[in-house]
Amino acid sequence: MKKQRIVVKIGSSSLADSHGGISKEQLSDHVAALARLKEEGHEVLLITSGAVAAGFSALGYPSRPVTIKGKQAAAAVGQSLLMQAYTEEFRKYGIVTAQLLLTRSDFSRKEQYSNAYATLGELLNRSALPIINENDSISLEELTFGDNDMLSALVSGLVSADMLMIFTDVNGLYDKNPQKNEDAKKYYFLPEVTEEIASLAGDAGSKLGTGGMKSKIDAAKTALSLGVSVFIGTGRGQEKFVDVLKGKGDGTYVGNAPQKEMKMNKQWIALHSVVSGQIEIDAGATTAIIQHGKSLLPAGVTNVSGFFKVGDVVEVMTQQGRVIGKGQCTYSAEELREIKGMQSQHIQARGERHNYEVIHRDHWVSL
């Protein structure tokens, strides 16, 4: 089996016991299986939930708190307990772990996004196993975000993973809720996530988790768009993750391999960047960009909206108002208003620029 880069996401329901604490038995089972992946020569990253579930009983809550301050306090206590438990278990296999706590803003800010990429790359090069969680104690997103499902998809794209394994307490995707319908049909393989499939998923999560099947399907769709195939399911024992790679996992495989990888810069533009303005373009420029993969030139620009700087991300729309994509602009809004509609030779005569693309195709994402 060739060396692969694998992201494994383990949800709260797969970690916590019935009283809300960390189940040592379940955690040990997961760690043993992750260690087997490493033993097989694969690079492994772990996205783990469970900080709130691990911490609420230590603070005296009889059950998972429902207030934001209660959840965040529980997460602050639980994250250290969770990491300590992982570190002790992985040490038995001689595996060095590293903790990364991320928030949505770490993805939306280009410099922090690049730093996360560089840090993860160095950790993997050093054979460490990164353990990643949302920074629950200061971030609201995780508490309504889907139990780290989307975080796992975004990280898998960031590191160009070969596969994302989302482990939960349900053995895959069904056309109906299998707990309520005996005739529910299981999907063993889905080539893509269609609107029909997405509509079948419910929002309800498990008792100790926040992410239902809908969040997992949304995460799978995002991962596929970033070139990462997905497995959603469950399992026990040391071989469960290796079995997934062999096609023997107890769940649903999503996506045909190999997927087309999206470069890091385009991932940031597509999924994380903040749009600072809009550019309207004519029909000729639309055809050149969409059908022929060309860069956007000033000659095709008909209107500029907003106030943006060089390097900011802008939306691009047709004269009919349809948004076709977005990208990093090489001109400020003020500069672009002065040269919109001008041919490159006329801009050259002004002597102001040596590169004349408004948005280079390497910094463009179609929507």
Curated annotation (Swiss-Prot):
Q: What is its main location?
A: cytoplasm
> SUPFAM superfamilies this protein is in?
Carbamate kinase-like (SSF53633), PUA domain-like (SSF88697)
GO terms for molecular function, please?
ATP binding; glutamate 5-kinase activity; RNA binding
Q: What pathway, per the record?
A: Amino-acid biosynthesis; L-proline biosynthesis; L-glutamate 5-semialdehyde from L-glutamate: step 1/2
**What positions does the entry give for ATP binding?**
9, 168-169, 210-216
The segment(s) forming the PUA domain are: 276-350
Choose any GO biological process term that the UniProt entry carries and state it. Answer: L-proline biosynthetic process
- Its Enzyme Commission number(s) read 2.7.2.11
Task: Extract one GO cellular component term from the record.
Answer: cytosol
Query: Which EC class, in a word?
Result: transferase
Q: Which reaction does it catalyse?
A: L-glutamate + ATP = L-glutamyl 5-phosphate + ADP
PANTHER family, sorted: GLUTAMATE 5-KINASE (PTHR43654), ISOPENTENYL PHOSPHATE KINASE (PTHR43654:SF1)
Give the record's family classification.
Belongs to the glutamate 5-kinase family.
Describe the task this protein carries out.
Answer: Catalyzes the transfer of a phosphate group to glutamate to form L-glutamate 5-phosphate.
Name of the featured protein:
Glutamate 5-kinase
Q: Which organism is it from?
A: Bacillus cereus (strain Q1)
Gene, per the UniProt record: proB
